[in-house]
Amino acid sequence: MSTVPVVQGAGSSNSAQDISTSSAPLTLKERISNLLSSTAFKVGLVVIGLLLVITALIFLVSAASFVNAIYLGIPAILGCVNICVGILSIEGHCSPERWILCKKVLKTSEDIIDDGQINNSNKVFTDERLNAMDGVVESLSRRNSLVDQTQ
């Protein structure tokens, strides 16, 4: 069995994108930051959230005869939060329209999960709690948009 020697010095057509061996390796914080800011990660958050919601709803429908089947709603709530985090972080900043959409998704999903009706009987995602988070979302959005401008 013979081996083929590796060709030295052959450049690629996109040599400007080649990784230089003389550059310092990325720190763990930089690697995690790059991963969390990638579009694939953000789309993955939305997909995982949808899978959690669908799975929880399948189990809730089949467990409707059980008395304490509410614990099966936990993955659905986590999935809705996961979807909203994905929506908010798709382009690095959160517009007021996106935040309003996320508030509606969270409130409606809790309404459907708790008693199957949209009757505004929320206990977790109430208007007061979601409105209290407006400042946090706005400051995170400003911070992310400033980071995007510097890059």
UniProtKB/Swiss-Prot annotation:
Subcellular location: Membrane
Pfam families: CRPA
Key words, A-Z: Membrane, Transmembrane, Transmembrane helix
Membrane topology of the entry: Multi-pass membrane protein
Region (Disordered): 1-20
GO CC terms, sorted: outer membrane
Location (main, coarse): membrane
TM region positions: 43-63, 70-90
Xref: InterPro entries: CRPA (IPR008436)
Protein name (Swiss-Prot/TrEMBL): Sulfur-rich protein, serovar E
